[in-house]
Amino acid sequence: MSQGKIIKVSGPLVLASGMQEANIQDICRVGDLGLIGEIIEMRRDQASIQVYEETSGLGPGEPVITTGSPLSVELGPGLISQMFDGIQRPLERFQTITASDFLVRGVQLPNLDREAKWDFVPGLSVGDAVEAGDVLGTVQETNLVEHRIMVPVGVSGRLANISAGSFTVEETVYEIEQADGSVFKGTLMQKWPVRRGRPFAQKLIPVEPLVTGQRVIDTFFPVTKGGAAAVPGPFGAGKTVVQHQVAKFANVDIVIYVGCGERGNEMTDVLNEFPELIDPTTGQSIMQRTVLIANTSNMPVAAREASIYTGITIAEYFRDMGYSVAIMADSTSRWAEALREMSGRLEEMPGDEGYPAYLGSRIAEYYERAGRVKTLGSTAREGSITAIGAVSPPGGDISEPVTQNTLRIVKVFWGLDAQLAQRRHFPAINWLSSYSLYLDEVGAYIDQHEKIAWAEKVTKAMNILQKESELQEIVRLVGLDSLSEKDRLTMNAAKMIREDYLQQNAFDDVDTYTSFKKQVALLSNILTFDAEANRALELGAYFREIMEGTVELRDRIARSKFIHEDQLGKIQALSQTIEETLHQILAQGGLDNERH
């Protein structure tokens, strides 16, 4: 530990001299209040420190003490269902201790509760050989999450002692005799620096789809477990609702939700909604698998920059246990703005639109920590992190640097469209400009595991929507009546896909989540209707007859998305009704017309 003194304060940036023994990325206690800061630049004996708390009132001459350790998170039981700020301070306990609704400066508080006791059940015996990543035992943290206590990275040897019972996160639970004769005393908790990715044995190709229950995503633009997706869009297009929906219903074990520089009301919504929502696969509250990191727009700017790293490090910890994790960052634009502000105060050469030249590498650094991996340890385990980042380009201009640097790295682009949002089409994901580079892997996985030609259905539906886009140009010029009857059927099929399938009400109890089996049934019915209608047209029926004879049928197809999951048979039975109805129309008028 070394001590220096402040020579300059510029917003969240503090310059201190006499810091020759300090290292870059060291955590410091700044000023008489002992504010938390991190060294981000060293020049001779002067250190530039970004302070994670409000710096008003700090002045030259006040002391700066380094701790000698980097910004780290505490990883152990007590993470799930908790709400932390950007540097992992527990906000609920913070409020209880300070009796204030605001972040009181200089308060030193352990990240994990030191008094809570956890029931540890050993999984190994004394004398067993262990290595980094091996699971020593488990703690049932919530009804949904079994917290696996692992051997820390860099430790291996023979298990000399292991105890069962109730322990706090600081009490010694096991001892490992290492090769050099030293004994490592382990607790339920371990620390890890946030800016360093946790190691793994091997990176694997992600193939299993992340089912979100959102039809437009799961059907046309799927993301895999271990993939990375970006959600850019203008204000009011529904980025946050898309993020919330994925956080609520994704088929993952753990969800990390990082509110980075967004409105406080959005985190309040999460806190109000999540405890009441039931996970469709387990029947438990989804809060029992969620970690919240709140760094709202009125919190210190520097902590925004740390919040993304805090979130991904916690995600890596659960990944190492063998869990599938989804991390939502809302919004990475605010994080990039924090980088821009700190870069400006450091007087660095600005890049495009004032962002630092290293913006692209920082964004890549974050998304590259996602992925499907084979974890460390003697037993084979697989874990994955799916990273989904919202991007808020000013004015919806996706040519700006944050969006462009993000799109270079991620393989899924859910482009939100202001025009769709204005037409009240939600989720407002534009099916013509969005893309997913995981379509082939997901299609092959579903065809193999579900034994249905899913990729073929998706291609057919997308072709109909693309054809509609081409026909709309003609309709605008010369009107709908100028189209051939076949083209008018295509326009009708596209309308059904858009309104009866892609459009989804996040606030309707049934429509908010659609299981994969229900998605297959809904899309199959629309495609069956289109195929049978085209067949009837070829055999002599008129477009007008088909439309007039299927009013009630089309209404039933439209309403089928509001049928409950446990009544899936009703949707599947509709396929037979579609065929019968169109055969009937053909029998009544089609063949007569052909004769005449």
Swiss-Prot record:
GO terms for cellular component: proton-transporting ATP synthase complex. GO terms for molecular function: ATP binding; proton-transporting ATP synthase activity, rotational mechanism; proton-transporting ATPase activity, rotational mechanism. It catalyses: ATP + H2O + 4 H(+)(in) = ADP + phosphate + 5 H(+)(out). The keyword Flavoprotein does not apply. It comes from the Bacteria. It holds the Pfam family ATP-synt_ab. CDD domains: ATP-synt_V_A-type_alpha_C (cd18111), ATP-synt_V_A-type_alpha_N (cd18119), V_A-ATPase_A (cd01134). Keywords: ATP synthesis, ATP-binding, Hydrogen ion transport, Ion transport, Nucleotide-binding, Translocase, Transport. Its EC number is 7.1.2.2. ATP binds at G233, P234, F235, G236, A237, G238, K239, T240. The keyword ATP-binding applies. One of its GO terms (biological process) is proton motive force-driven plasma membrane ATP synthesis. Produces ATP from ADP in the presence of a proton gradient across the membrane. The V-type alpha chain is a catalytic subunit. Belongs to the ATPase alpha/beta chains family. This is V-type ATP synthase alpha chain.
